[in-house]
């Protein structure tokens, strides 16, 4: 029997972040304290590549650390690679009623919980979501991509190359944007906007395996991430940006407290 793996959206974390941004009463500035100059310790550079670690049959973990020309640590990319033969994928969605990753995991018992998609201020999806075989919202047209669960299994597709057909019997789906790797492993985001942020990605490699990735330090622009994925040895056929900014996150349950990124 396949283990359950859910792509869950949206998150209460978005609401909590908004609450943290509320204005606070202005306090008197603290007194200035001058300390003697002491050289700061040089941060230890983590291994650039952990290699694939098998967590259980069909599930592998890899951590890739990115450095610049001066060998300074810029980004950490957590990659989970899943063989669809071992897992059941699904999308859960409560319009207007977001939950935290931990709450979704407790409610569903899923092995892996990942947030994704874009929403209005009232937490309604701006693109198409299919949850429990029921459609919500409207499909993007000509841009972005879709994570879909069909009778044959999960897939990541380009909506420009393969538009959504309301007649197709999808079990679950989530649309997002932009496409970072176009089908065939081609660069998906050629323009540089200069905006750095944390990112969550879903991808499918040439062997049909599903990858969930999170770039946790916020160093990548969309173009930079697109270029990185295309040049990597992950052999990705197509990759879709799921989320960006503080809400990016995934939760992998397991022994102890599990693995949380984001």
Where are the language model's segments positioned?
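Bacterial N-terminal signal peptides that target proteins for export
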Residues: 1-8
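C-terminal motif of bacterial Sec signal peptides marking the signal peptidase cleavage site
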Residues: 17-19
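Zymogen propeptides
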Residues: 21-139
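Short, surface-exposed charged micro-motifs
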Residues: 79, 146, 201
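Short acidic-glycine loop/turn motifs at beta-strand connectors
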Residues: 82-84, 148-154, 182-183, 204-208, ...
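Active-site-proximal beta-strand/loop segments in catalytic clefts of secreted hydrolases
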Residues: 83, 114-118, 159, 215-216, ...
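Active-site-adjacent helix-turn-beta-strand microarchitecture at beta-sheet edges
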Residues: 114, 119-192
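Conserved, well-ordered active-site substructure
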Residues: 123-141, 190-241, 247-262
């Amino acid at each position: 029997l396949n283990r359950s793996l859910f792509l869950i959206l949206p998150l209460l974390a978005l609401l909590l972040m908004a609450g943290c941004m509320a204005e606070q009463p202005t306090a008197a500035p603290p007194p200035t304290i001058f300390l003697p100059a002491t050289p700061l310790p040089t941060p230890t550079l983590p291994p650039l590549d952990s290699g694939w670690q098998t967590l259980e049959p069909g599930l592998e973990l890899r951590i890739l650390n990115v450095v610049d020309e001066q060998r300074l640590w810029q980004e950490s990319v957590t990659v989970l690679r899943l063989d669809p033969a071992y897992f059941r994928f699904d999308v859960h969605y409560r319009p207007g009623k977001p939950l935290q990753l931990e709450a979704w995991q407790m409610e569903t018992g899923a092995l892996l919980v990942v947030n994704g998609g874009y929403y209005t201020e009232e937490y309604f999806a701006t693109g198409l979501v299919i949850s429990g075989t029921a459609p919500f919202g409207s499909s993007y047209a000509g841009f972005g991509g879709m994570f879909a669960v069909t009778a044959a299994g999960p897939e990541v597709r380009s909506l420009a190359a393969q538009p959504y057909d309301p007649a197709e019997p999808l079990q679950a789906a989530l649309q997002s944007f932009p496409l970072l790797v176009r089908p065939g492993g081609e660069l998906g985001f050629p323009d540089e906007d200069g905006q750095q942020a944390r990112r969550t990605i879903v991808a499918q490699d040439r062997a049909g395996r599903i990858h969930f990735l999170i770039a946790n330090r916020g160093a990548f622009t969309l173009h930079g991430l697109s270029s990185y994925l295309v040049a990597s040895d992950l052999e990705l056929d197509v990759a879709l940006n799921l989320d960006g900014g503080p809400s990016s996150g995934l939760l992998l349950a397991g022994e102890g407290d599990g693995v949380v990124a984001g």
